[in-house]
Amino acid sequence: MLVTLRRNGDIPRLTVTVRTGGRAPLSSPVPPKWPDTPPATAAYAAAMHRTLADDLSRLPALLQSARDVAARELAGVDERPVARLDKAPDREPLPVEGTGGEAALTRFAERWAPGLSGSAGPRYLGFVTGGATPASVAGDWLTSAYDQNVSGAAGSWAAALERETVGWLRELFGLGEAHSGAFVTGATVSNTVGLAVAREWLGERLGVDVSRDGAAALGPVDVLSGSPHSSITKALSVLGIGRDRLRSVPVLTGNREAVDVDQLDAALCELNGRPAIVVANAGTVNTVDFDDLRSIAALKERHAFWLHVDAAFGGFAALSPTYAHLVDGLDAADSVCVDLHKWLNVPYDAAVQFTRRRDLQTRVFHNASPYLGLPTGDPDFLHLTPENSRRLRALPAWFSLLAYGSSGHREIVERNVALAHRLGEGIAALPGLRLWAPVRLNVVCFTLAEKPTQERVAAVAEAVAATGEAFLTPTVYDGTPALRAAFSNWRTSEADTDRVLAALASLPLGLPR
């Protein structure tokens, strides 16, 4: 082993070189202590804006100050108000000279930080909002520090790291190697990518090159689903298919949101062989109901359709032996959406999309500018999603998966499900409230025992938020206004669940009129 000290401009680099027999040596830079003297020469500093030069000379101190603010926030997130309902500050004019990073940090801490929600905390049960595990926060910080543009592989290992992470996630969700994947911003874009590939598949079946001729060349497209998320209709609008092309298929009776497979079969028969898109749901928003994926996939023996599965958070059922049966058949899908800033508990924004037809995906998203090059057998990520440029979103997920493994993330899922059942049992026992759907996984859907109007339900949600103890989101289920409490945060405990229940119980006479 050879240790040498080299200089890169004014910054020393300690390099450890390991001899590996006849192979080329492997060199790994070990960052030394930041130099006490400013790294910029006088000429360099003279050419740089004053505040930039000052921040560069004090970079370690600035990062330490930011670290201290973050550490205080994370240490107190359990007790800070879960939601802030007061008015935000008025806008200020754009600075001309700038204050420097330290002053900006102070201004943020004084002016804006107090009004940010406690959405990273354990009692933020609105929407389906995960927190950020300690390892994923560290990975997210380093994502910014290394500042990689992961869309292209040239000159960096960043794309290889993402491919490794996608492979781990594929294994985590029980998908076979036929599925390739890429990171995107969230479930909406993941669904959009999956449906874009489905649109290209329709063209393949109908003899139309959609990527060249446009969606209009397909004619009317049939999209069938039982209880789709609103992001599906948004995706259909973006893709030029049209929101109104989504055809609702009846669901099972008995307080269910899962599609009736017999009704789906009948709807496909009515198409007389015309290819279609079927959107199956692995975890509906209100009750976390699951379509019978295996039975839906079996319909492909008789009908021509692309099977897209929205498994934004329900896909995490695969992590638990107790609940994995709910996603049986997921591997048979042609494309799959999974959101990672929900139940994987990595910082916003992160999701992954999978598909069996990377060739069609590349046809849709390839960017063939001469300086970018043409797609290859293992195309760069800029050829797979709408983004040509993006950060290394995979790194926080890589950190969390490596730090806690599949067993650590399984524990989060199983604990959250147990806590959802605990809250559901408590709500069922509270006067004035009524459990409105069975607790199937991690969401509790409930409403008022009397007069569950939209106004009264919204008043309950606001009253709970005003206590600072919890945050819930209103919804409508089976035609009735209701509330949802979604458990997906790694921090949430029985004590947190009991505090949410106490906040509900503290409302006057159960509820405002």
Identify the role of each PLM range.
Residues 44, 303, 477-513:
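PLP-dependent enzyme catalytic core of the Aspartate aminotransferase-like
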Residues 169-196, 247-250:
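Short loop-beta-helix segment that forms the pyridoxal 5′-phosphate
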Residues 190, 196-362:
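Conserved PLP-enzyme active-site core in the AAT-like
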Residues 328-431:
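Active-site C-terminal subdomain of aminotransferase-like
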Residues 434-464:
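Conserved PLP-binding catalytic core of the aspartate aminotransferase-like
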Residues 438, 443, 467-484:
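Conserved PLP cofactor-binding pocket of PLP-dependent enzymes
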